[in-house]
């Protein structure tokens, strides 16, 4: 059946025991005039996306399986070092001015309100998932040379049935050359957003994600805003999502601005990135200088979990090192800035000693 040359043509046909609709549209889109997303992203639901359109990863490996981001012990450590600052978690969002609301409470009511605020903060601090980048889709279904040159535009055919998960949704593209292929991930994301709009997401990515605009955002210490927009706009296993997150983490590490993400849902992902890259020195020094030695110890423990064959993990195991001693072992073995870490620890211990003497 030949496609009718109209902006939107619909076909209905019987497919098995259910009715399905396939939609054919020209693969063109107009860029939205707005530059930034106006809607604040909602708390991210953690879950592994289904990838039935890409080739399955090989299961089973002769190597010892390393801890994954969603492992219970990993999540416990990352949640612990993230911290819980209610003032920061519930900081005012940029929105139209409204008169403040004041309430008179008894002590019991205040304690209950605080408890509810803590529970709400834990929901807001739920970490977005960290996934491997999805494999590209390069499946060609047919080469119809007889159609070559009959059209100058691509046509996208989409199954818009409501009972199909988006990862399983059948979407194909007819090229002007006559090639019929499966849509790429980027094409799928755009088309799905057209027919099934997601709040806070656009069909075309905002210009804020261009490198020159990201540098401006970083210079204004708006790293958390960039990551919030990124979570709203992209799928967690997309190349752009991973790229923006890594760029943001590297800028924070370069300038030592770890506090910008502390007590946000992005701190755990940042710590996980540094541990995987064996670049925890800067974060470790920052934690020690902020009197967060317990968090620094947890960070080194996580490092040893991911790199159990390293010299630091081996020596810590032999010495049964704990607490500050665990950090010292790391500083003497695998740290890139070991002298700075030892100096920070020395300063911390001197302060603790002076406080103990004063009391």
From Swiss-Prot:
Q: Which Pfam families match?
A: MRP-S22 (PF10245)
Q: What does the entry list under GO cellular component?
A: mitochondrial inner membrane; mitochondrial small ribosomal subunit; mitochondrion
| Cellular localization per UniProt | Mitochondrion
Top-rank taxon of the source lineage equals Eukaryota
What is annotated about its quaternary structure and interactions? Component of the mitochondrial ribosome small subunit (28S) which comprises a 12S rRNA and about 30 distinct proteins.
Instruction: Name the family the entry cites.
Output: Belongs to the mitochondrion-specific ribosomal protein mS22 family.
Name the chain's protein: Small ribosomal subunit protein mS22
| Organism, as annotated | Mus musculus
The top of its lineage is: Eukaryota, Metazoa, Chordata, Craniata, Vertebrata
